Structures are given as C-alpha cells and as structure tokens.
Regions:
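Juxtamembrane intracellular "pre-TM" segments in multi-pass secondary transporters
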Residues: 2-12, 191-228, 416-422
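Short amphipathic helix-loop junctions that connect adjacent transmembrane helices
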Residues: 35-51, 242-259
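Central cavity-lining transmembrane alpha-helices of secondary-active solute carriers
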Residues: 56-72, 264-277
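Conserved MFS/SLC helix-loop-helix module at the cytosolic interface between two early adjacent transmembrane helices
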Residues: 66-103
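Helix-to-loop junctions at the C-terminal end of transmembrane segments
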Residues: 68-79, 273-287, 375
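C-terminal ends and interior cores of transmembrane alpha-helices
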Residues: 90-103, 297-312
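Cytoplasmic helix-loop-helix junction between adjacent transmembrane helices
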Residues: 111-150
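Helix-loop-helix hairpin linking two adjacent transmembrane segments in secondary transporters
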Residues: 148-188
C-alpha cells in the first residue's frame, strides 16, 4: 500500500488524543495498585491468605482477558479501533464501581471478570498508533507511547496512595470516574484511525479462539521467536506486579502511601527510558540489542527483590531493584512492540494486538496464581528467583529470534477519519 499525506492539524489532533487517552488509561489502571491488597484484606479471615486471594482475583481477570482478547482484536480490525476503546473504558468503569462497593469476595471476583472481559483499550490504542505510523518509526513511537504510559503510571499510584489515607475505596471510585471520562472523550473527540480499505471483510470463527490465534502467531517464522520471548517476559513481570504490594507490606512494612510513591517513581523511570533514551539507543543499537539489554536489567532487578524477600529486607534495595526492573521492562517492551508490529501487515495490527493481549492475559492468569503459591508455600523470594531465571532464558531466545527489516515493509494508507478532519 502507498501512503497518503495527512495535514499537520489532523495528525496533531490524532496525537493529542493518543497522548490524553494513554495517560488517562494507565493512570486509571494504576491508581488502585497501592490499595488493592488492603481492599482485599477486609474480606479475608486470615491475613496469611492475602497473597493467595490477590492472586486469585488477578488470575480471574487474566483468564477472562485471555478468552476475549482475540475477539476484541478482530473486532478492531473489522470495525475500527474506536468502538473497542469505548467498550473497554465503559467496562473498566463498571468493574471499578463494583470493586469499590464490594461487600464480599464474590463481588470483587465479579468485578474482575467484567474488567478482564472488556480489557481491550491499551491494545487498541497501540494498534491505533500502528495505523498512523510508518513501519520504520514504530519502535521509536511505541517508546514515546510507553513514556506517556509512564506518566500515567507515575501519577496514578501517587494519587491512589495519597487518597488511601482518606479511604482505601476512594482510589477505586476515582478509577471508575477516569474510565468514564475516557469513554466520553472517545465518543466525542477520537477520530477513527483504520481506513475502510485496511479493514478485514469478515471475522472468521476460528480467529476468535485464543488457542487458534496462538497457533497462527507461533506458526509464523517472523513472529515465533518474538512471541516466545514475549511470553517469557510477561510471566515474571506479571508475578512482580501482582505480588509487589504484598511483599512491600510483608518485608519492609510499607503502607499504601509509600507503595504508591514508589510506583510513581517507576513511572518516572519509564518516562526517562522510553521518552528520552530509546530515541538515542534504537538507532545506535537496534531493536534486538535494546531488548536483550532491557531483559538483563530486569533479571538483575528481580535478583535484588529476591534478596529483599529473603536475607536483605532493606528499603533501598527494594527501591533499587524495582527501578532497575522498571527501566529494563520499559526499554525491552517498547522495542518488542515495534518489532512485532513490523512483522505483520496493516490489516493485521488489531489481530496482533489481540494475540499479544491474549498471550499477556494467559500469563496474567498463571502469574498471580504461581506467585501467590510460591510466595505462601515455598518462600517469599521464590517468585523473584524464578522470574530472574526466566529472564535469562528470554534473553537467549530474543538473541536468536528473527527480526523483520522495517525499511522493506509497505506503508499503510493513512487513517480516513484523520484525513476527514483536515
């Protein structure tokens, strides 16, 4: 396909909406992170069961996302990115309202089911970015979008931790409000990015089965190594995210405010790495070297956290390990997103988003259960030791994976709604 030009004003409008939606989405998702264990703690009879129940709630969320992600991805390829983003935002608003109202563990479980079943906003936003970006610029722009996510990650937990001093439910209700605002912005201001000629003609039933999506994605030579690496990265990072607040509470006695401030610092690191450093590193090192370097950083960060959970329960080690892990994840994920996006065509960006979201959801189903079980039964350090080992394996896989040369890829036609806005 050949590219057509877009006016500076229409391109600027699309970018402004991407910036606003990405920051609001990540801020809304992360506001609740510092308070999640403390909300759950109200409904468990034994505090020692906290890690297990947090794991169960996140696993339910991941399982539902795993089952529905291929459908949402293909919907965005058929009807556009905008409807999927709207549905995801409304689903998040409803689920967070239920979670805040609570009353029993089954209500919290229902809320996570709704959240997982409508979790298509970030993949659709990244597909939107791929629609309006030429292949050779995708890795860098995914890095910029990751930096915007970092701003949301910085603001969300800090606000959540501060509001928790008033009520642990208040950040949850704030998340619901932010999600509703996102839906309104999409309805009234977001232009569609996917041109009619780049949409698929129909949706095959086979495309909606998550295992069928995996079979096709892992069956492609240009995607196989990247998808394996993606899974190996997602599992340990998922264990970290879902066990982070519990370990901070158990090992160094932190409450919601301190946890929220550290997650905000993680967001600052994301901004620096993805917003500034990647623009310098990618042209000099290439995607493969950036990904491998990021993986090594994550492995070292997880090793530091294992020390905190076992023999060195010092806040400075916990902070250093978390920030190193965040820096490595930010670099590796942005470069990985760009590499995978370049491996498929313009009419498959939604399919790819559904495939990676489904794979990430599968890991998000396994990760909290595995982390909770290892943490409660084996040792507090076990999830982080396993995570560091998996990172080493991921580095080897990515070092041998096939990468597509972006310069050889055709450019997608520019988005129709963006053209119409000119």
């Amino acid at each position: 396909m050949t590219s057509s030009s877009t006016s500076p004003s229409s391109d600027r409008r699309a970018w402004i909406m991407l910036i606003v939606l990405t920051m609001l989405t990540t801020a809304g998702m992360t506001v609740v992170l510092p308070v999640l264990p403390f909300v759950v703690l109200r409904y468990v009879s034994n505090e020692s069961d906290l890690a297990v129940w947090v794991g169960v709630l996140e696993a339910v969320n991941g399982l539902c996302a795993f089952l529905i992600a291929p459908f949402l991805g293909r919907l965005s390829d058929r009807f556009g990115r905008r409807p999927v983003i709207i549905v995801a935002a409304l689903g998040a608003a409803v689920s967070m309202m239920l979670f805040g109202i609570g009353g029993a563990l089954w209500v919290l479980l229902l809320a996570r089911v709704i959240q997982g079943a409508t979790a298509g906003d970030l993949p659709a936003l990244f597909a939107y970015l791929a629609d309006i970006t030429p292949p050779e610029k995708r890795a860098q722009r995914f890095g910029l979008l990751g930096a915007l996510s970092g701003i949301g990650t910085m603001v969300g937990p800090a606000v959540g931790g501060l509001l928790a001093a008033i009520s642990v439910e208040l950040p949850v209700f704030l998340t619901a409000a932010v999600s509703f605002v996102i839906a309104l912005l999409c309805i009234f201001l977001l232009p569609e990015s996917l041109r009619p000629e780049n949409r698929i003609a129909s949706i095959r039933v086979a495309d909606l089965h998550p295992f069928a999506v995996f079979r096709e994605a892992f069956g492609r030579r240009e995607l196989r190594g990247l998808m394996i690496g993606f899974a190996l990265l997602a599992l340990p990072f998922g264990m970290f995210v879902n066990n982070f607040s519990v370990m901070a509470y158990d090992s160094i006695g932190w409450g919601p405010t301190a946890i929220g401030l550290l997650i905000a610092a993680v967001g600052i690191v994301d901004i620096i790495v993805q917003g500034a450093l990647l623009g310098v590193l990618l042209p000099r090192m290439g995607e493969r070297a950036v990904i491998v370097s990021g993986i090594i950083g994550q492995a070292l960060g997880l090793a530091a956290l294992a020390l905190v959970a076992s023999v060195l329960a010092q806040p400075w080690v916990f902070i250093a390990g978390s920030l190193l892990l965040a820096a490595g994840q930010g670099a590796a994920q942005a470069a990985m997103d760009g590499a995978m996006s370049n491996a498929v065509g313009a009419d498959e960006q939604g399919w790819l988003g559904g495939a990676t979201q489904s794979l990430n959801a599968a890991m998000s189903t396994v990760a909290p259960l595995l982390a909770g079980a290892l943490y409660a039964v084996v040792s507090h350090a076990a999830p982080y030791c396993l995570g560091a080992l998996l990172m080493v394996v991921a580095a080897v896989v990515i070092a041998r994976a096939r990468f597509t040369d972006a310069a050889r890829l055709p450019r997608a036609a520019s988005p129709s709604a963006v053209d119409a806005a000119a």
